[in-house]
Amino acid sequence: MNELAYLQTMPKQTALLKTHCADFVVKEQLGYEMSGDGEFVAVKVRKTDCNTLFVAEKLAHFAGIPAKNMGYAGLKDRKAITEQWFCLQMPGQPTPDFNQFQLDGVEILEVTRHNRKIRTGSLDGNHFEILLREAQEDADLKVRLENIKKNGFPNYFTEQRFGRDGHNLTQALRWAKGEINVKDRKKRSFYLSAARSEIFNLIVSARIRQGLHHKILVNDILQLSGSHSWFHADQKEDFNLLQQRLAQQDIQITAPLIGENVQIASDVENEIIAKHQELLYLMHQEKMKSARRPILMQAQHLSWSFIPEGLKLTFYLPAGSYATALVRELVNINE
């Protein structure tokens, strides 16, 4: 992450993140309400310093079902206070009495039924409440906050995506070179995700360094902010109009998540991907579907206050975007 370009400049201050779990609060928001009936038992949980997979296994064991019959919208940070939904597939079975469920760091907030499985893709986004300890109120930090509110921040994948010390990316590169064979399904998924996240980050960083993060290029693939559908900015388009729409946040410039049939739009993308052909080949070999992702992200409802302990932030991000990518534009972090 240190080598990736900043949208502003490298921060001047250093702050502490996640000194305590309460310094990093995440509340997920699904894209729908629970139906109240159906074959799935939906359980809303508040967990402190707990791994998502660990809690899922304990809930499944309590309900007497296989862990594979559990569902959730995504993995949440361990060193944090997080609220998220789990679902248990229990057709024709009564709802367990979760008042009897006991696990350190876990509180059951709500239990209901639902008519479909909660899975990746169910998540609309996450609300964040973050305390950056030891951050000092000064003019530079205030300008950074205002710039993020106005212009957004690089939509980088951050350290969580790459594993401890970049282990997932290292393993993906070894796999691509034929040095290892990966049989475990979850590891395969983690390694493939890390590999294409790395390519995405490099492309975003290159565009920022070249001053192209707010400039639409011929053949760029743009995303409509409302529907999230894509279209090509080919030579027939009115580029002055496209730039106006970009400034109004009606459209967004995207970069690729490489996979099968990846559409390479600009010379910047071509140049980066050409240097990582072994990873592109691995994506084809594993039949990963290609996708696109906005290169910049706008934090919704961003607000802040300086308190004696440091800087307190609250904001909302759509699914897939990382709060630590926003924080990176503000301060250097000691965890």
Swiss-Prot record:
InterPro entries on file: PsdUridine_synth_cat_dom_sf (IPR020103), PsdUridine_synth_TruD (IPR001656), PsdUridine_synth_TruD_CS (IPR020119), PsdUridine_synth_TruD_insert (IPR011760), TruD_catalytic (IPR042214), TruD_insert_sf (IPR043165), TruD_pseudoU_synthase (IPR050170)
Signal peptide: none
UniProt KW Transferase keyword: no
PROSITE patterns: TRUD, UPF0024
Keywords from the UniProt entry: Isomerase, tRNA processing
Domain of life: Bacteria
GO molecular function, one term: RNA binding
GO cellular component, one term: cytosol
Family named by the database record: Belongs to the pseudouridine synthase TruD family.
Protein name stated in the entry: tRNA pseudouridine synthase D
Species of provenance: Histophilus somni (strain 2336) (Haemophilus somnus)
